Amino acid sequence: MGMPTTMDLSHLPGEEGPVATVRNTLGWIRSGVDHLLAQHERFGPVYRTGFAGYRVVCAADPDMVLSIARDNQSWSTSLAWLTFFQGIDSKINRAQLDSPLFLDFEPHRNARKVLQPAFGHSATSDYFDAALSLYEAAAERWVARGQVSFKDAIRSLMVEVSTRIFLGEDDAAPEFERALIEYWEGPLALVRDPRFSRKWRRSIRGHRRLCELLRARIASRRASGGDDLFSRLCAMTGTSDGLVDDDGLVRLVIGVMSAAFATTSSGLSSMVYLLAEHPAWQQRMREELLALDSPRMTYADSQSLDVCMRVWKETMRLYPIAPYCARRALHDVDLGSYRIPAGTFVFGLISAVLRDSALWTQPERFDPDRFTEERAEDKRHKAAFLPFGIGVHTCTGMHLANAEVMAFCHAMLTRCRFSLERPYRARHTYAPAGIVSGPVKLRVERL
């Protein structure tokens, strides 16, 4: 890729080596943000470590995180994620990629041009209606049973939602679920060789299967059309003057589906845990949702909710889904008083900023009111709250993700109240999206 892979980082505080890499990777997976805060306290705002087989520099200072997230002339998103996923998809080795996650500059702008119409207001409203119906049916099943192992159930449900709104299919969820999960979990493998790592081998297999499933559908979608994202993209890329070919189309959809199912299911698991622990906030959200004028929730309704959105934001602060922004240095860059060599793999620790006591009042406490206009703690620094990124790499599906969460809240909270079967003290984990620990097993009672 034209970038150095070995750099002298000995001038930085921290630790490296196989033992440190295993310890740090397991710390991320098991203890998430708590592990990162402990590392920050031990080594300072900039330190070197190992993660999932790579040498990494971590930055926890808000100004540094903002600089890393916004400065596209010094930091490359493309090279970071290409490095992280290299070996899962054979085409990564030839840098023939079209997912916005793997691109910078003009290719990134071209990919977003293809995606943005498929995430416009009208399209997102259609996706919202389809998702709401599935959420309502699931909530009814859980109420009828009186209990649900929520983390497992929501993961399966979100694959079902993704295949409905992104592919327009109702029966494809089971075959996509296994492939998506296998693919998504691969980058956390400590050994990145399919001969010695079952997780890495499964990830390669999952990606290959996703490509097969999607490629087999392209011709029929171009012929028949549809309101789902895949059909819209098939129609657009068939006449897009070569911005994205069919391989690129497949990669775009894999990127969207992977991000959508994993991140939204993780966020909802964390939010439901918090609401089970804080029934007063569960009731406040319920009252706001029941007060809507519409006989059935609409996409416009989802954008008008205040209490529900504050709870969702506080969930993403306490249990960040994306704990860091990954970059590689395009040239030698200064982070504080340290010189970072070109090619260095760098993580801007968004999750550490989300617990910074200089920005957040009692940051360990669940307090959605910190997002009110009066307190506006999320406005104290431009890097204080970046759950969907910033600048050109802001998540294209941000509005859909927020709307999906509001739709789920309406489906669940207007039908039932819920509590934990066995209360437990949860922690933030990373597997590979940030998520609350434990199974989140619920007792569910009809209103």
Where are these regions (language model features)?
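Cytochrome P450 catalytic-domain helical core, especially the substrate-recognition surface
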Residues: 2-37, 55, 82-220, 247, ...
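Cytochrome P450 proximal C-terminal region
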Residues: 9-12, 40, 135, 179, ...
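Conserved cytochrome P450 K-helix/beta-meander segment immediately N-terminal to the heme-binding cysteine loop
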Residues: 74, 348-376
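Cytochrome P450 I-helix active-site segment
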Residues: 13-18, 227, 274-322, 336, ...
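Cytochrome P450 catalytic-core helices
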Residues: 261-288, 398-415
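Conserved cytochrome P450 catalytic core segment spanning the I/J/K helices
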Residues: 20, 120, 207-267, 282, ...
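Cytochrome P450 catalytic domain signature, combining two hallmark sequence patches
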Residues: 66-87
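Cytochrome P450 heme-thiolate "Cys pocket" and heme-binding signature region
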Residues: 97, 101, 296-300, 338, ...
